[in-house]
Amino acid sequence: IKCKDGHFAPGSIRPVDWEMQCLFYGIPEWVDDPELRDRLKRQEHISKIWEKISPWYLARGKREIFELALSSPWAGGMVMTPLDALSDEHLEARGYLGEVLTPQGKAVAPVRPFKAPGLPITPQAVSEMGADQLDVTDSPRSLELRSFSDMRLLEMTISWAGPYVGNILAPLGIEVIKIESLSPFDGFRTQRPYDHGMRPGQEHLVEDNRFYEAGGLFNAVNKGKKDCVINIASEEGRNAFLKLVENSDGLVANFSAHVLPQLGLDFETLKQVNPKFVVVRMPAFGVDGPYSDAVGYGSIIEAMGGIAHRQGYEHEEARVSNIYFPDPTAGVHAANAFLAGVYSADQSGSGMEIDLSQHEAMWQHSGEAIVLASTQKRNIGRLGNREPGGTLSTFAATRDNWVAITAPSALTGVIEALIEGSAGKTSEELVSAVKLAGGNAQVCLDPWSAPLKQPLSSLLDVVDHPVTGPMRHVGSPFTLDGKRPVPKAHAPLFDQDTDEVLSRVGHLSVDEIAELRRAGHIGGELPPPASLGFIYD
């Protein structure tokens, strides 16, 4: 939303987000308005809402609005530009940006991927091209690395960013144990795109607790994990969890910065239990700094992380996507952080705490924009559909599909002539013609038809599930030794593995586990979906 000096992204996903906005806007009567408090119904009243709130934003600067968000539970984010990043108090306090020496002079850029002992490495410098070339030897250096199958990760995460860590690591053979509780459990179990509808033919599942097992979003990012339900808020549950820590390699958690310390699970406590333990914490804005207590999720991180400023066409203003790029981005970074931490612990015998800010992880993808801002004192522009450089980049409509096209500038006339007649061609005919002319082209796929097309279909995994049956999921985004890792099992049912994990990993006896379950410290059953407002319509 346009404000006095830029743009602001107001979070509106959670009920508390809407409540705080209404109070700040001075319209508290909207909090309980049945047509507005429901996020899905709210979409039908965009014009009414826009007319009321636009003047409020235009009268205020983005930092002024952000300060309101910082002072409350409201998730909201400034649309930060690269010039904003250079002077941002939070990034400065966390030491994220630093001086980099280049052949063209000094520049400012990100100097580390996350906060951890030994980072950033100094000096930060970019060498002249070819300055560091070495002779290639025929005998590659071998590393003494532990097998993935010998590693175990405890995952205390919710939604997408955190669970994506285990979603990447589990197919490698790493044992990933998802830690849940009755309150809170992973809310992704309840999420459905756009509405609370079910897969066609499975609408009846919302009538009982199979609803929590049928969500495509949850099942997509939790494949191959174990599920262990522990009430860590109780002393007995916490002690049971520490038994798992004793025999695991690490923990990843994507809660707010204060959550683990409040649970008595600060790094020093965990390290006393297991000296080689690696903790990867991935709050929206990191563990410390002025914004560390701020709430953030996909759209907020897109705004604060430089993406919203760059998305769209030249004539447009800032925009966030409907994809939430920061979630999987942070997940990939955190998976790498865990593996780096385990490698370090294996070499040194000492664990470490890694502070991974999702905000900073997103800025990693705009490093050149920060360099440009620091050297030329200007913000990078929007590219729209274009590729960087002097190439032709566009989309063309055909009889059956859209086609993405790129070509060298020298071929502009030839390619544009082909595009002029594209309405009479099929997409495959246009792709062939563009390639024959020396350009490159690809049919634009959609989520419905893409799974049937080669080569994309080879990147999908069909995973059988006891509640939903076979479902297609996007596969691992990489190969190992030429083979793509595949899930070892479906996403776990709630409380599926609690007793087995506590016995095998925590070395608790059958009687100890039974007593913990009887007293409500482990396991349990989620409430009926209807009691939480999930009713299929």
Specify the residue positions occupied by each region the protein language model found.
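Active-site loop/turn elements of alpha/beta-hydrolase fold enzymes
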Residues: 181, 232, 284
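Acyl-CoA thioester-binding alpha/beta core of soluble enzymes
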Residues: 1-187, 192-206, 271-281, 362-537
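Structural scaffold positions in well-ordered secondary structure
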Residues: 169, 225, 252, 270, ...
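A structured beta-alpha segment of the ubiquitous adenosine-cofactor-binding alpha/beta core
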Residues: 154, 203-272
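Conserved anion/nucleotide-ligand pocket segment
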Residues: 319-372
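N-terminal Rossmann-like NAD(P) cofactor-binding subdomain of oxidoreductases
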Residues: 251-309
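Alpha-helix N-cap/helix-initiation motif
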Residues: 158-159, 233-234, 323-327, 491
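The feature captures the short pre-catalytic strand/loop hairpin that immediately precedes
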Residues: 305-322
